[in-house]
Structure formats: C-alpha cells, structure tokens
Amino acid sequence: MLFLNAKFIDLDLGANAVIVNEEDLKGTSYYPQDRVLIESHSGSVLGILYSTKTMVQKGEVGIPVRKMKGISLKEGEEVNLRHAEKPESIQFIKKKMDGQVLSPNEIRTIIDEIVSKKLSNIELAAFVTSTYVNGMNMEEIVEMTKRMAETGDMISWEKSLVVDIHSIGGVPGNKYALLSIPILAAAGITIPKTSSRAITSPAGTADVMEVLTNVELDEEELKRVVKATNGCLVWGGGVNLAPADDIIINVERPVSIDPQPQLLASVMAKKVATGIKYAVIDIPVGKGVKIKNEAEGAKLARKFIELGELLNIRVECVLTYGGQPLGRAIGPALEAKEALEALTDPKSAPKSLIEKAISLAGILLELGGSAQIGDGQKLAWEILESGRALEKFNQIIVEQGGTPKKPEEIELGKYVEEVRSPIDGYIVGINNTSITNVVKEAGAPRDKKAGLLLNAKIGNKVKRGDILYTIYSGSEERLNSAVNLARRVYPVNVEGMMIERISKF
C-alpha cells in the first residue's frame, strides 16, 4: 500500500488515471497500467496507474479532477493506493478475441465494467478490435444493445408515437438532419434527435448543431425542449444515454473503425433509451463510405430491421447514394451555414441535400400518419418551402439555449486556401476518404471553423484556374498541413476529354 498526498490536475487520459512519481514506485510491486484503488475517508475509486518524472512530486498522486467521481477529496489530503482486482470482463474479452460466442451475462458484465470505468483504454481497444475482427451474432448484439441502454437514462414520453432518423454516417457533409428534424417537428411529429459526435467523419450532427446552439442537455432539459417544439438535436452523451457508447467511440475514433456489432448496438441502444417506436435508418452506399455496394447495404438493413423487431421498434432502412459528399460543405461551421441556407432558400440549395432530407422525412411522415403512402416527400417539401421548417429550427435553437443566426453570420476559419484546377476538363471523381482526411487535418471537428467547401461536383465542367475547393482552418499550421495532404491525396480528380494521343503502332 502507498500513502500519498492528492494533487488535482487538469488532464484527461480517458480512464480514471492516477499519476505517481516514478521514485515512489521504485522497490514496490506497483507498475504503470496497474489497476489501483484510491481510498480516503470519503470513499474509494478505481484508477489506472501512470508514472511520471515531473508532473507530480515525490509523495504526491496526481488525480484528474474531471474523472474522480465517487470520491470527495481536498487537495493535499492523504490517500491510500492499493492493488485492485482485475475486472471480470477481461476473460470475456479474451474469449471474444478467440472468436467465441459470449453469453448474455458475459456481455452484461463487459458493458457494466465499461460504464464503471474499470477497463483501461488498452482493454477497451482489445474489446473493440475483437468485435471488429470476429463480429457478433444477433443474440449477442441484442444483449449488448439492451444493456447499453439500461446502464444510462431511459426516457419515457406522454405521446405514444415517437420517431427518429439516423444515418450510419461515413459521408462527408451529411447534414440532412438539420433539415429533416425541423420538417417533422413542424408537422407535429415528436422526434427527439440524439446523435454522437464524429467517429469516422469530419463532423457529426452534434458537432454541426453545436455551432448554432447548446447540444449538451440533461434528460429534463431535453424533455422540456421536445415538449415545447416537438423535436431537438442534441448530443446523446450529454443526456447520459447509453453511456458505454461514448466511451467506446472515444476508442474507435483514433483508428477510424466502427465495428458492425458496435454500429448496430450504438444506433439502436439510443433508440431504446429514448422510447422510439419508429426509426428510419439511412445507409449511405458507395466508394469511400462504410458500405461499399447495395448488396452489402441490404444485408446491413436486414440486420437493423431484425434487431428492431427484437427490441419492439419498427425500423425501415433507406440505401442512399454516398459516392461523394452531401451538398458542398464539409466541416461543422460550413455545414451549419449550408443547412441554414437550405432552410432559408431551399430552391437554391444543393439538390442532393434537399432530396435526401425530404425523402427521409417523407418516410416518417407516412409512418406517423401525417401523409398518405407516397405523399410524404411532397408534404416534406411543402413544409420546407413554406418556411415552417426554418421557423421550427430557430425555435429549437432558442429552446436549447442558442440565438438564431443568419447563414452569413457564421464564422469560418480565418486561414483559407483555394485549390484550383490544373487543366480544362471534367470532375470525374471526388474521394470521400481524401476529403475526410484533409478536413480532419485542417482541424475538424474540434476546430468548428475548419472545413472544405466544394466549388464543383462530379460531372461538372471546369477550366484551368477554376477553384475546385476551398480549405478553411483556425490555425495557419493546420491549414498548411491540410493543403500539403491535399496535394498528395487528390480529393477532387479532374480529367480532360483527351486521354492520350497515339500516332504510331
């Protein structure tokens, strides 16, 4: 056992990290990454041990303030450190790494220990990798989904019909929800939209909406907003919905993987937790997104529908074109601006954005009884064109704590680089992966003002010197790095009509 004095530090290492000077560890049985219990007169909390030469002095233990829930300490107070038992779920993670099927109890134990932060980031990464490599059967996914929902807030509603739209993501600029949700809410349909922050894309719905208003609402605030407006657009982590999901996402994000079992459970756990009865799942298909072809998309759709049936949620899936970005704007601020422009003047907005938004909203208008089968898309367009969707969107912004803005009032990164066409020709390809990587290199999604604006899309004719796209960043260094990356990965591909001249055989 070690006796040390608590020192509060502002550092987030993911798990409940505790930091000890390496001099205090010499000659002991304590090693970095050991699991330890921090004990004081007020209680105890589990932590993962890290060592340092300079961050804390000999005789101190560094405790990240934001992570030490469950214990009340004063700085300088003496605490005890002792070895903690290894989590039970470690053996079950190894079992999944070996490709075996997990029992319901084993899955519940893993999720419980993720939520209680008994697992280190390394152990979490092992679990995520095991499901990425070996997958899960439907029984495992159902159990994981239920437990992910049960370990967080479970929201109930006065209305019996509550709906949701969700995209599995992967498409840069996928901002459809900022149009679809206010369309549905304006029609009187209850749609409490909760979403994750970006995992593999440069901006999630929550990242984009955060440019315009507060997205971190608790359960009571969320219910108040929905009661006032019929809808909301908030971050699921702020409401404590399926808390294991955001912990897992933080492990997935650095390596840009989203294992299908986690994808299914992540999406549907939040539907269970928010009391959803009808859900439309958008599955983008195309080069550079998660689902490469229609056959693969149909297979995933069947899994979503089956999982929904087992959870008593009616699910319809839509395969959408994902071969290039949705609209022209990629990155939180740029996407928020484009969404506002589309709500303000839908006739001038990118057709791909409008078509996707009203198509998805139209399905739920039909399922919810607001429109006859086949008339949903028409009604969605009428609500959008009339200005009712913009009015509802601004109402949601206000209720969530923001102030409505005009598109031109949204600030973009002050460091800008225009990339021009080297030849006369046509846009023959836009690489989603390259676009995503360039925008991330520019600083998105953490830098809300970072992004990329496409001046041309596939099939457009361009002349030499025309602007192909513009990169924005809040950092000159990040902008230069993004531009250098763009020169290597060619986000936009231009080709002339003449491929090669051949005069001899």
Curated annotation (Swiss-Prot):
GO terms for biological process: AMP catabolic process; pyrimidine deoxyribonucleoside metabolic process; pyrimidine nucleobase metabolic process. The keyword Oxidoreductase does not apply. The keyword Hydrolase does not apply. The active site is at D258 (proton donor). It catalyses: AMP + phosphate = alpha-D-ribose 1,5-bisphosphate + adenine; CMP + phosphate = cytosine + alpha-D-ribose 1,5-bisphosphate; UMP + phosphate = alpha-D-ribose 1,5-bisphosphate + uracil. PROSITE patterns: THYMID_PHOSPHORYLASE. Its EC number is 2.4.2.57. GO terms for cellular component: cytosol. AMP binds at G170, S196, R197, A198, I199, T200, S201, T205, S266, K290. It is an enzyme of class 2 (transferase). Disulfide bonds: none annotated. It comes from the Archaea. Pfam families: Glycos_trans_3N, Glycos_transf_3, PYNP_C. InterPro entries: AMP_phosphorylase (IPR017713), Glycosyl_Trfase_fam3 (IPR000312), Glycosyl_Trfase_fam3_N_dom (IPR017459), Glycosyl_Trfase_fam3_N_dom_sf (IPR036320), Nuc_phospho_transferase (IPR035902), PYNP-like_C_sf (IPR036566), PYNP_C (IPR013102), Pyrmidine_PPase_CS (IPR017872). One of its GO terms (molecular function) is AMP binding. Keywords: Glycosyltransferase, Transferase. Transmembrane segments: none annotated. Catalyzes the conversion of AMP and phosphate to adenine and ribose 1,5-bisphosphate (R15P). Exhibits phosphorylase activity toward CMP and UMP in addition to AMP. Functions in an archaeal AMP degradation pathway, together with R15P isomerase and RubisCO. Belongs to the thymidine/pyrimidine-nucleoside phosphorylase family. Type 2 subfamily. NCBIfam families: AMP_phos, ARCH_P_rylase, PRK04350.1. This is AMP phosphorylase. It comes from Methanococcus vannielii (strain ATCC 35089 / DSM 1224 / JCM 13029 / OCM 148 / SB).
